[in-house]
Amino acid sequence: MSTLEEVLREAYKLVTPSEEEERELKKVTEKVKALIADAINKYGIEAEIGVYGSSARSTWLPGQRDIDIFIVLTNRNINIKDVITLLSRYFSERGVTWSMRYAQHPYLSLLVDGYEVDVVPCYKISFGERPITAADRTPLHHKFLVEKLSEEQRRDVRLLKLFMKTIGVYGAEIKVEGFSGYLTELLVAYYGSFIDVLKAASRWRPYRTYITFSESRAKFKAPLVVVDPVDPERNVAAAVSLTSMSTFILASRRFLKNPSITYFQQRQGAVIKTNVVEVVFPYPNEPPDIVWGRYKRIGRSVFNWLKQCGFRVYRWGVESDEKSYVSLIYVVEQIELPPYMLHRGPPVYDGAVDAFVEKYLDKDIIGPFVQGSRVYVIKRRRYTNISDCLKTYLGKGDYTIRINLYEGALVRKNAWIT
């Protein structure tokens, strides 16, 4: 069994970028900054250029190939959409590959030398000033963290990110509903180190954990609350679902009890053969957050429908490559149900008992009969085959139902837990 010190020593190697990666990142960053500087000069845009995010604070993970560059507008009369239009024209003229992305407002994502560089316009604000767009806070976030995090703590941020990535809770997008990069940095800044974050998290309780860097009376309804030091009316942990928070609590407890390098390795556990049904849809041409949000809602409604039909669902989830398909996966007790089911009625002394009995008098059922104090019938199921049940609910459409072919994460042994 490895000691905590041995595991951390090995894990630190996994989260430290090579000198070559550092040089390449800096080279691409400077290249795009120069292009943006030329563009804002050409079009007379009053702005400052800032590199923010993990690449600017040395909290990025090896292999990460994305950079965030902000155009901080100093003139609020400038429309962000106009800036995007001018920049897209500029990059097109110079043969730079770009695509339009959307958050609260549009921004550009460039592909430069194998790196994805997000170019995000925002307005310049001061501490205590209300943001005009969500992106306006980013320069202030950067300033706060640069002042708070030591070099050792930045290394611990990288460790925490890989830990969270391994257990599946890293990322604030709807796909994950987990911890954002900014949130991981705040946790290390607040508690002091990677181990101290885990020790604290092992004592967290959902809906009773409130973290703030200064006195705050703001109220939030969320499993975890971390008040933004830049905007006291904002919960940085708003995206963290109950499941993600609870997964992190469990992983923290288990790692501290039995440290292992498995918490920092992207591995797959063995497939456990069980009954599983998968509904596969073609991937729509829409932003990922829209797609994940929609199919999570559809997935929940299908889960409820399967329960109504008598199929016991052990667990379910949504998976996608965000290119060609999106799937709803259900791990179930049975694919085929027996033709008859026991249906419980009201107690014999309840006023509703007469209506229940009369409903089934002329039906092809066993009963009505009394068991204990209740009336029951044994009646024929509407659906015995899970595919028929799904087709009725989903109707005609462009989807495929696959039975017992899925071998993804939902039917695998947990590879990291110790």
Swiss-Prot record:
Homodimer. ATP binds at residues 54, 57, 141, 161, 170. Disulfide bonds: none annotated. Keywords: ATP-binding, Magnesium, Metal-binding, Nucleotide-binding, Nucleotidyltransferase, RNA repair, RNA-binding, Transferase, tRNA processing. Belongs to the tRNA nucleotidyltransferase/poly(A) polymerase family. Archaeal CCA-adding enzyme subfamily. Mg(2+) binds at residues 66, 68, 118. It catalyses: a tRNA precursor + 2 CTP + ATP = a tRNA with a 3' CCA end + 3 diphosphate; a tRNA with a 3' CCA end + 2 CTP + ATP = a tRNA with a 3' CCACCA end + 3 diphosphate. One of its GO terms (biological process) is tRNA 3'-terminal CCA addition. It holds the Pfam family CAA_C. Gene3D superfamilies: Beta Polymerase, domain 2, CCA tRNA nucleotidyltransferase, domain 2, Poly(A) polymerase predicted RNA binding domain. This is CCA-adding enzyme. A single active site specifically recognizes both ATP and CTP and is responsible for their addition. Its EC number is 2.7.7.72. It is an enzyme of class 2 (transferase). HAMAP family: CCA_arch. Its cofactor is Mg(2+). One of its GO terms (molecular function) is tRNA binding. SUPFAM superfamilies: Nucleotidyltransferase, PAP/Archaeal CCA-adding enzyme, C-terminal domain, PAP/OAS1 substrate-binding domain. Catalyzes the addition and repair of the essential 3'-terminal CCA sequence in tRNAs without using a nucleic acid template. Adds these three nucleotides in the order of C, C, and A to the tRNA nucleotide-73, using CTP and ATP as substrates and producing inorganic pyrophosphate. tRNA 3'-terminal CCA addition is required both for tRNA processing and repair. Also involved in tRNA surveillance by mediating tandem CCA addition to generate a CCACCA at the 3' terminus of unstable tRNAs. While stable tRNAs receive only 3'-terminal CCA, unstable tRNAs are marked with CCACCA and rapidly degraded. CTP binds at residues 54, 57, 141, 161, 170.
